[in-house]
Structure formats: C-alpha cells, structure tokens
Amino acid sequence: MYSFMGGGLFCAWVGTILLVVAMATDHWMQYRLSGSFAHQGLWRYCLGNKCYLQTDSIAYWNATRAFMILSALCAISGIIMGIMAFAHQPTFSRISRPFSAGIMFFSSTLFVVLALAIYTGVTVSFLGRRFGDWRFSWSYILGWVAVLMTFFAGIFYMCAYRVHECRRLSTPR
C-alpha cells in the first residue's frame, strides 16, 4: 500500500509542478507575425521581446484558464489528501484518504484535458488559419505531460485504496 501511495505522491508532485509551470508560462503557441517571432500563453502574448497582458475576454480563453485553475486546485487538494493518507489517525475514518486523493487526481486530469481540448480546438480551427507559420510550444506540451502524471497519480492512489480495502476485509474481527 505504501509503495503505491509513494508512487502516487511522486507523480502528484511532478504533475502539479508541470501543471503550474504550464499555466504560468507564455509558450503555449509560437508563430511568426510580420517577420518576427511571437508566442502566447494563457495570460500574456509576446511580440519580439515585449510582452502584453491578454485583456480580451473571449470565452475560450476564460474557459481554458478556469479549467487549468480548477485542475491545479484539485491537484493541490489531492497532494494534501495523499500526504494525509500516510497518517493513521482515526479522524475521517469513514472516508478513505487514498480513495479521496485518487478522485482528486482524476478530477484534475479531467479539468486539464478539458482545458487542453478547448485550447487545441480553437487554436487549430481559428488561430491556425490566422497565423500561417505556427506551432504548439513547450508550455502546451507540459500540460499534456501533466495530464499523464496526474492520471497515474490517481491510478496509484486507487491501487493503494484497493490494497488497503483487501487487507481490511481479510483481517478477522
């Protein structure tokens, strides 16, 4: 059980760090505009060496940002539950902490996938046509790696829960 929780906690830390870095950086998309390179993130866009805030209140930007923030909150809550799973205190005895951590990481995964799907759909269908020479960049790729890490954190915590339940049910009363 502890090895599953340790693996889950490792994946959780890495996934959450990648998620926060992806959300905070400005390299989701790179393109060429008027002969110079430009790049953009969720919060800013940069032309040359000068960056500007994204002040447009466009629905897909707001949805992508909201889902990324929800994902980060779920991942942080999952880490807290995952750390609490190592303690054997009788508080919250009706709620399994590894199970709760697993649910939080699956929720985080769902929110990241929704954010990346919205961003991908809009970028390919609208922005891709607007800018001829463009590509997704490293911040966006970190988001997809965070999907894998939070998903595997959820898997590890669900395995830890299953092992714990099997042991609990097999011990005589």
UniProtKB/Swiss-Prot annotation:
Mitochondrion keyword on record: no
Primary location class: membrane
Membrane topology: Multi-pass membrane protein
One Gene Ontology CC term in the entry: plasma membrane
Phosphothreonine: residues carrying this PTM: 171
Domain of life, per lineage: Eukaryota
Transmembrane segments: 4-24, 67-87, 99-119, 141-161
Biological process annotations from GO: cell-cell junction assembly; lens development in camera-type eye
Extracellular side, ranges: 25-66, 120-140
Positions on the Cytoplasmic side per record topology: 1-3, 88-98, 162-173
InterPro entries named among the record's database cross-references: LMIP, PMP-22/EMP/MP20-like, PMP22/EMP/MP20/Claudin, PMP22_EMP_MP20
Glycosylation site list: 43, 61-62
Sections of the chain in a coiled coil: none
Tissue expression per record: Eye lens specific.
PTM annotation (Phosphoserine): residues: 170
Cell compartments where the protein resides: Membrane
Keywords on record: Cataract, Disease variant, Disulfide bond, Eye lens protein, Glycoprotein, Membrane, Phosphoprotein, Transmembrane, Transmembrane helix
Disulfide bridge partners, by residue number: none
Any one GO molecular-function label of the UniProt entry: structural constituent of eye lens
Family: Belongs to the PMP-22/EMP/MP20 family.
Function text: Present in the thicker 16-17 nm junctions of mammalian lens fiber cells, where it may contribute to cell junctional organization. Acts as a receptor for calmodulin. May play an important role in both lens development and cataractogenesis.
Record text on subunit structure and interactions: Seems to be associated with itself or another lens membrane component via disulfide bonds.
Pathological condition linked to this protein in its record: Cataract, multiple types 19: An opacification of the crystalline lens of the eye that frequently results in visual impairment or blindness. Opacities vary in morphology, are often confined to a portion of the lens, and may be static or progressive. In general, the more posteriorly located and dense an opacity, the greater the impact on visual function.
Stated name of the protein: Lens fiber membrane intrinsic protein
